[in-house]
C-alpha cells in the first residue's frame, strides 16, 4: 500500500499597503496574467501580494541571501514556489532580463535600483507592459510616462518599432 505525504500548505499573507499597491498595479496593467518581476526585496510583501491578487508568474530578484531564503521558504510552505514564483539570488541592477518578458516590473526597494530603469524597461512586453520604479529621472525613449497613486509609471505602448501589421492567412476574407 502506498503512503501519501500529508502536507498542509501555510496561508500566504501580505501587508495592507502592499495589497493596495498590487491591486493598483494589476488594474493599470493589461491584465492579471503573464510575468511580473520584482527587482529588489524588502520583506517580500509586494511579491506575495502580487501572487495573492493575480495569476502572474512572479520572478523576485535580490542579492541578499537571507531575504531570498526567507521568501523562498514562505512561498514553498504556501505551495507556490516553483509553480507560480521563483526567487533568484542575483543583483537586481545587473540581472540582464530578456527583452519583452514582463507584463509588470516593480520593486520593493526603489532607491537600490533607480539608476538602472532605462535598461530594465527593455524587458517590458509590447502593447502595455508597465513598470513602477518607485523613483525615476527622465523617460526611456519609446515609453509613455504617467503617475499611479503618486508613483511614477512607465508603459510600453503599441507595437515594437519596425514590426509589421500581420495580414496573413484569412486576415482579409471578404
Where are these regions (language model features)?
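A short, aliphatic-rich alpha-helical micro-motif
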Residues: 30, 98-99
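ADP-ribose/adenylate-binding Rossmann-like module
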Residues: 129-137
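Glycine-rich SAM-binding Motif I of class I
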Residues: 40-48
